[in-house]
Amino acid sequence: MADGRHNASRGRGNRRSEATKGTLANEERLRALGQAVEHRANPSRPVRAAKVRRSHRGRRIAIISSVVVLALLIALVGGGYLYAQWRFSQIPKVNVVGELPQLSGRPFNILEIGSDSRAGLTGTVARQTGASTNSVAGQRSDVVKIMHVDPAAGTITILSIPRDTMVTLLANQALFGKFNRINVNYGNGPSLLAQTITANFGIPINHVIQVSFAGLINAAVALGGVYLDFPYPAKDAYSGLNIPHPGCQLITGFQALAVARSRHYQWFQNGVWNYDGTSDFGRIDRQNAFLRAMISRAKSLYNPLTINSFLSKIPQGITLDSGFSLNELIAFAVKFHSFNPSNMLTYTLPTVPATVGLLGDVLFAQQPEAQQLLVNIFGSSLLTPTNPPPNAQLQTPLPPVVATTTTTTTIASTSSTRATATKTTTAGAATKSPSNPTAVMPYFDPVPCTP
């Protein structure tokens, strides 16, 4: 293994950012702001200091909305409520039908959609992603994640649903059939995707955040790039990834997008280009690593100019549901301002591969493992599916009844045993999600690092 990976691992053990200075003062100001906002909304309630609990230890983070929350949080601390309110008003909003109201103090779920829309891309970047300068190509949800936030427990959990997962469609069946991949639902906007997730899996959706190609690129550029340690030279001819040298290096612009999009990842080891055949599962892991690095980078930049640049670029490629209020973001920030990203739990829906007619290689929810994971994550808030996903026989049985376990850590990330990938796997094949309870990041994948 490359020395860079060893050094990065050693550095991750005990790292302090430049933001350590003044942290206590910032926290006091943040708590005071949160109390003021809460009192404004509920003047009859006494103002009490926010208590932050430690969460269970997790593995990786995969959520660009955390970066948005963090940036707004820093703006609040450094620039005041009115400035953050103005910046928040600049973020595009979309009406989402089917959302359930968020109840104060109760767990809630944020649907995170990574769209393959090329809107906002121009010139070389547009051509590299397959779009011309005058057209917008693609409108599918290549990233589908549900962020489960439990304010009382102080925990955050991320569930990823692979894009090839088969679901029962609620609309457009004449065009796509009764059953199809989950990512075809996004062409009509986030409402249909949110409703499909609830109908198929019983997961209630309270909020939505969408991120396009331009949104991810702009966020990385505004932060001055993120640092990732590549243990080997790497490339992906499909996404455009090109890392000629190993080691900890700054990734920004188009290469940042290329890392997050990489499904055909190759690494150069012992004179041979090796191929990661795990497809979407590999991409999920690399997205998690990239976004964890992005959040670490954002947390280290308590620079008003940098944060202002980041906030100014948020409207270019990021959209929130119209019901997501600034006060809710502030409450979220007050509760989780000391939350360590490494303590976030991440999971991938257990699936099994199959080939279905013209659809080719797809994935089906693996039962009872999938239902067990959903129950463990969402608990009593999980609803009974009205349109369950199909099994490999294209039948739609109700999910099995399973018991809630004492802790969600009993089921590890299902994208955790990818180190068995070989260069002989068919490029476009859907791959079964591993179920090894020991979550280990593949040795060839990039990880966050400190230069």
Each PLM stretch: what is its role?
Residues 2-451:
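Non-catalytic, solvent-exposed segments at the cell envelope interface
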